[in-house]
UniProtKB/Swiss-Prot annotation:
Cofactor(s) the protein needs: FAD
Transmembrane segments: 27-47, 214-234
Protein localization: Endoplasmic reticulum membrane; Golgi apparatus membrane
Organism encoding this protein: Caenorhabditis elegans
Annotated protein name in UniProt: Delta(24)-sterol reductase homolog dhcr-24
UniProt keyword Transmembrane helix, yes or no: yes
Domain (FAD-binding PCMH-type): residue spans on this chain: 47-239
Primary location class: endoplasmic reticulum
Phylogenetic classification of the source organism: Eukaryota, Metazoa, Ecdysozoa, Nematoda, Chromadorea
Family: Belongs to the FAD-binding oxidoreductase/transferase type 4 family.
Amino acid sequence: MNLVDEKDEKPTRWEKCVEFIMFHFRWVFVVPFLLPLSFLFNTVFDFRNRIVHAVNSAPNAHVRKVKHIQEQLKEWNDNGRKSKLVNARPGWLTMSFRFPLYKENATKIATDKLFDILDLDVEKMTVKAEPGVTMGQLSQYLISRGYTLPVLPELDDLTVGGLINGCGVESGSFKYGMFQHICTGYEVVMSDGELKNVYPDSAAKTEQAKQDNSLFFAIPWSQGTICFLVAATIKIIPCKKYVKLTYKKTETLSEMCEQLTEDSDRNSENVDFVEALMFNKEKGCIMLGEFSDGPDTHDEVVNPIGRWYKKWFYTHVEDLINKKHESIEYIPLRDYYHRHSKSIFWELRDIVPFGNNVLFRYLMAWMCPPKIAFLKATTPNVLRKLYDRSHVLQDMLVPLDKLEECIDLFHKEVEIYPMWLCPFYLKSQPGLMKLRNATHKMYVDVGAYGVTSKDGYHHERTTRRLESFVRSVNGFQMTYADIYMTRAEYAEMFDRTLYDWKRASCKCIDAFPDIYDKICRSGRR
């Protein structure tokens, strides 16, 4: 792997000037154009979804959409399977910061109309949804009916398909695992056009049932390189109107690690959500949530943090721990789930620097946040070069007992705060994330998002040092982010045994790109 010398990356004075203007004044375009456009898009799409639910047209439409996908694949097979298959979703709609290069010479299959909720089964306690359904859609649909997902990742625009083919972790994950672990079945279309329904049936008797069973475990994290996901059946649980959220300040790194380990007991009956934020290397806050019907007395605080005029959540947390060592609030459930959406965690502070100003919040924040897809589509190349040099967007998944070492390394290499910490339960199952030395273990997602000013930061070299540490502790790297691992290093991090077997047995090798070719940095621009 060739590394670019840092001296070759240094911009000219003119480039620095242009970058400064584009970075610090991007809001001039975002606020008057992207905010209204995002608000209009969300309003129209929400109205469309309400009509679809009212007339119950989604199930019949789903059959037609799947048939259209099968027809496209039949045509591709009849033409001799001459190119690789990819979905036709535009690159700017994906959650990755980069645009895919592997799609340029591939056959694009139109799967981009799969964005409906298909069925709610309250007897089996499942919801069936197409892969384009977002977490915002699901939370709105389910909570109004008294249900929720055990794991519902925070950002509104995250999709079912992205969380299965990629990865999903959320504050309920310490108890239920990753998003893939709450899925009970997948509906997929294979490269030959065959429609399959696959389940994790451990009691499978026939050879075909065993084949389909193994396919179920091969799909998560596979990035759509085995089949086309057209629907998923997902567990649901009953919910209450509020989350009783306890904020606990920690004053040292060791205290954070010890307390977070203690609080991440998945057998706890009084805790339903666990996450933490580090505001510098020592100061942090652990947040413990519990489903609740609301406050028992008038003295207890109800905080609807999802209202447009409310502070960005992470700033609210920091304000609280600066005043008190421990606080309790009652937050409406949907507001809690999407607590990081309004500020896109803390990325919006660089795009709209005054976005948390009280005047802006009251006058303009009802249109926030700008859609991530629109931000990505309108990022100019000159700004991408700046991001290449200084922007960090990484989620590293490491064993919880290695958290202190991991934070030490992140502080040394990138020093971006806040830092997101989300513990999750990882059980050993077949697939790319198979644990090789345990049956189950508590992990933690360490998320670093933003622009670093750390001296000596080099996008490739620094990322490779982080990747090396994660591999050394049997951790994993979320593959939406920039990945600089070699093919061999990727195979060291992820267990490709089942993946490669299903690729061969399901005739995928000539049909889909290899997963490494899709997620490596050279496959994206």
